A protein has these predicted regions:
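N-terminal low-complexity, acidic/polar interaction/targeting segments
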Residues: 1-214
């Protein structure tokens, strides 16, 4: 994925979305329709294409401090001014503060952000294999209900990337996804994803058993 330069993070556009958590190494399709975000999209396309996708609480309006910065890699404009885009996740960031300068020029939120690098530690081969097994079993269970479901993986992803991809595509609870995003130790992150997939798999099995009994 494209590495975003530090100066870009000095005033990066922020797209707050409820229940959406972007991760590095994943692709997020979005539909842009609000006027302020159309303006944001225009500015992004005129610049380096970078923006932060941050989870926002529907009730309080609070934007998560930790988010992911990505780059627009596909843009499909529609005749009425709306657009479909795809954002490629690049890195974890911490939103240090919202930028308030020149507000009339920018109808959308911008922030000063700092890149968050994960710890330089190795994930045990056994843990990586266990995550692959947990994801494989969960996907197989999902496919019983939705035969069209597919989980696309890059060739030989690192354990860290594997955890992020599985969290993005397979973890249902956005609050749990946020916690996984915030964890900078890939060893812990791998276990968090495994544990959550086990919980979800068990819930699906219990639901299926209950359906049969009824």
């Amino acid at each position: 994925m494209t590495r975003i330069e530090e100066e870009v993070l000095a005033g990066v556009p922020v797209f707050p979305l409820p229940q959406v958590v972007l991760f590095p190494e994943v692709f997020l399709p979005l539909h842009i329709f609000e006027p302020r975000y159309r303006a944001m999209l225009t500015d992004c396309l005129d610049g380096d294409g970078a923006l932060v996708i941050a989870q926002v609480d529907r009730e309080s309006g609070r934007i998560a401090d930790v988010a992911a910065v990505g780059v627009i890699v596909d843009h499909r404009p529609l005749p009425d001014g709306r657009s479909n885009i795809v954002v490629a996740g690049s890195a974890r960031v911490r939103l240090d503060e919202l930028v308030t300068e020149d507000l009339p020029r920018y109808p959308y939120k911008r922030a000063r952000a700092t890149r968050l690098d994960e710890l330089d530690v190795s994930v045990a081969d056994g843990d990586r294999a266990a995550l692959v097994a947990a994801a494989t079993m969960f996907v197989a269970e999902v496919k019983k209900h939705d035969p069209t479901f597919e989980l696309q993986m890059p060739t030989q992803p690192t354990a860290s990337a594997l955890a992020d991809i599985c969290a993005f595509h397979l973890v249902v609870d956005s609050a749990v996804r946020q916690l996984i995003l915030e964890e900078l130790d890939p060893r812990i992150r791998v276990r968090m994803v495994m544990d959550q997939l086990a919980v979800q798999h068990g819930a699906m099995l219990r639901e299926a058993k209950g359906t049969v009994l009824n």
